[in-house]
Each structure stands twice: as C-alpha cells, then as structure tokens.
Design a protein with these regions (language model features):
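Non-catalytic protein-protein interaction segments used by genome-maintenance enzymes to assemble
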Residues: 1-46, 50, 54
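Metal-dependent nuclease catalytic regions and adjoining charged, substrate-binding loops involved
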Residues: 2, 38-41, 50-159
C-alpha cells in the first residue's frame, strides 16, 4: 500500500490584519452575495487550502480570502469574502478523507467504480455523461472513439 500525497497549487498566502490567510480567486456570472459564498462552507478546496497551508508554513492560517470577479455584459464587479475552519472542522475533514480513500481503495481492489449519477450535471456537466448513459457492454468502444488517453495531470510539475 502506497502512502497518499495531497498536492496542488495555492494562488497565494498573504498577511491581512495581522493574520495569515490563503487567497483564492474565482469568477462567476451570477451576483456574488451571501448565497454565492455559502458554497464555500463546507467545501473541500477551502478546507484543504487551510490544512495544507498550516502544514507548509508550520503556523496557523486564519482562513481563506475569496476574491470574486463577477463578469457580466457591460460590467464587472469585484467582491471579497472569507471562509474559516476551526481545528475541529479540519480534523473532521481529515477523518472524512481517510474514509473516502479507504472506499476508493476498495473500488480499486474490486476493479469496479460505481457511477455517481448525482454529479453528472455539476460544473457544466461531466464529459463522460454520454459514455455512462450507454449500456455497460459498449462503453469501452465509446471511450476509445470519443476520448484520447493522456498522461495524468501531475501537480508536482512546475506550471
């Protein structure tokens, strides 16, 4: 069994009002009010940013500053929001991560990955939706004809 390595790229880390924060930039076409910022509590990306920053810098991170650019026809608007994680929340997130990793290990051992059909329409829709909607015995053919196999993304490579 190999150890897991969580990795990615932080946009930046800043000092703000005497505290250390991770900063993230987002764009949206909708109005970024309270409802918009609610999507970041809870949120895997923001929780992991908090945890990773604390590991990397060896000191507490107060939270994540989310700078949002609303892009619309004829105007742009910029809004700043904040999200915070308590030590209990980060511990719970890590516990949940261990659970999901064990589950994924079981899928890998079985050689079977069940569909998560509640996520097909998220974030503009899954690229594999057309394949998954086919009968299981023809999916491999659709994969080969509609997709190109590439080298997996490696976040350890410099951008």
């Amino acid at each position: 069994r190999q150890p897991y390595l969580l990795c990615g790229h932080l946009d930046r880390v800043v000092n703000f009002n005497g505290d250390k924060y991770v900063m993230d930039q987002k764009t949206t076409t909708s109005t970024p009010g309270a409802h918009y910022f609610n999507q970041y509590e809870p949120n895997n990306q923001m929780s992991l940013y908090t945890i990773a920053s604390q590991v990397i810098f060896g000191s507490p991170i107060r939270g994540v500053i989310i700078d949002v650019a609303q892009v619309a026809v004829g105007f742009s608007r910029f809004i700043r929001g904040f999200t915070y994680r308590t030590p209990d929340q980060t511990e719970e997130w890590l516990k949940d991560l261990r659970y999901w990793l064990r589950l994924a290990e079981g899928y890998a051992t079985e050689g079977y990955w069940p569909q998560n059909d509640t996520a097909c329409d998220k974030f503009g829709g899954c690229r594999f939706r057309e394949v998954c909607s086919k009968s299981p015995h023809v999916r491999e053919q659709f994969l080969k004809s509609s997709f190109e196999k590439r080298e997996p993304w490696n976040p350890l490579k410099a951008r």
